[in-house]
């Protein structure tokens, strides 16, 4: 009986992990902070995309953004960064124009001149429903699937370079 319970628990955990939001390809149709349409097709532009979920209220997020701007330019077509500004919408999915303007100013000030997305309901109810702190960063392959681990908290430029280079070497 004990062995049967263990098998049931292990099977249940495997089932849960296999159906995790992070195991599925990301699909969305949203706008960037400049109002342009953007979808999951953006991931096809590079071998690997670093997705950085951040907030305008988050000091560590903003402090790492200059380094992310440098990182975005370093690896050419093989790599890109996409930011998702988590606090530009409320819990009902309504866009907060004041926060979007704040995000634009932060991007300009920090030199983080990569794509920054206002999350739509499919992002909020999908991959972002498992984000509990910012910054949270994960990597997506060209087909839109999350690869590797999820990173919570900011990192230095050197730390991010090591992580990105390990992804690029395996792709």
Segments from the language model and where they lie:
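Conserved redox-active cysteine motifs that mediate thiol-disulfide chemistry
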Residues: 53-70
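Thiol-based oxidoreductase modules, predominantly thioredoxin-like and allied folds used
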Residues: 79-97, 112-121
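Sec-dependent N-terminal signal peptides
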Residues: 7-17
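Short, internal strand/loop/helix patches
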Residues: 99-140
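Short pre-active-site segment immediately N-terminal to redox-active cysteine/selenocysteine motifs
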Residues: 47-49, 53-57, 88, 133
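Thiol-/selenol-based redox modules, centered on thioredoxin-like
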Residues: 139-171
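Sec/Tat signal peptide C-region and signal peptidase I cleavage site
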Residues: 19-23
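A short beta-strand-turn-helix
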Residues: 29-49, 73
């Amino acid at each position: 009986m004990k062995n049967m319970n263990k098998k049931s628990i292990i099977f249940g955990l495997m089932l849960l992990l296999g159906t995790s939001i992070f195991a599925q390809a990301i699909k969305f149709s949203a706008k960037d902070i400049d109002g342009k349409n953007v979808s999951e097709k953006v991931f096809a532009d590079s071998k690997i995309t670093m997705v950085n979920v951040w907030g305008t209220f988050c000091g560590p997020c903003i402090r790492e953004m200059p380094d992310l701007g440098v990182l975005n330019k370093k690896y050419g077509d093989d790599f890109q960064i996409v930011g998702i500004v988590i606090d530009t919408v409320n819990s009902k999915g309504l866009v907060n124009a004041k926060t979007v303007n704040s995000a634009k100013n932060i991007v300009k000030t920090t030199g983080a001149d990569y794509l920054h997305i206002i999350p739509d309901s499919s992002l909020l109810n999908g991959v972002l429903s498992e984000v509990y702190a910012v910054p949270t960063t994960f990597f997506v392959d060209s087909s839109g699937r999350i690869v590797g681990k999820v990173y919570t908290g900011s990192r230095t430029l050197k730390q991010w370079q090591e992580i990105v280079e390990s992804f690029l070497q395996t792709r």
